[in-house]
Amino acid sequence: MVVSDNAQLVNFREICSGSIAPGMLYRSSHPIKDNKQEKIISMLANKARIAAVINLCDFNSGIYSKAFFAPWYNRLLKNRLVIALGMDFSVTSNSFKRKLKKALKFIINTKGPWLIHCHAGIYRTGFVCMVLESFMGAALDEVINDYLLSFNSIFESSIYATQKADSQAAMRILSVMSESMTINEQNLKQIAETYLQKTIGLSVKEIELLKNKLSGTY
């Protein structure tokens, strides 16, 4: 099995659409499952030189016992380079918005490459990545296709196989950023930036810092 197949197995891939710098941002499923490290993710994370992790699914109270099983992850955690946010699945909830702001400020205040993950690397990770890709100027079809790619992954178990996703479903999720405005190729980037400023609450300065971090110009 080649590395690309292994990466697909655990939903590990680079995000390099729009002006996101090569080798700067990655996504995956959880690096530690059932008290065992995912060896494929460990290998790929080391190869990518992951320097900080945004964990969308665990709480601080649980991540320390898990991290013990993955030395690279545990090292980052001890150096305060892992943020555990315990996000729910409701991307419109106030709790989700507050935690997304924490995730973005974590990126601003750390150095990449960054890895974003939840449990399966599909829903919560998918939404956060759509926001960042849109914000950094990715084409609409790139954003949608990246979200859907996780559903086509070999990683999908029977649990996820029953939850079919298509481009219309992805657009509905993406439209969370736009409120009542229809998203299109021309307004996607501006909608994402407005969402980060007005809904998530980043300042103008923080938005510029986030752009610089993701584009590798900091």
Regions flagged by a language model, labelled:
Residues 1-115, 127-218:
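Cys-dependent protein tyrosine phosphatase-like superfamily
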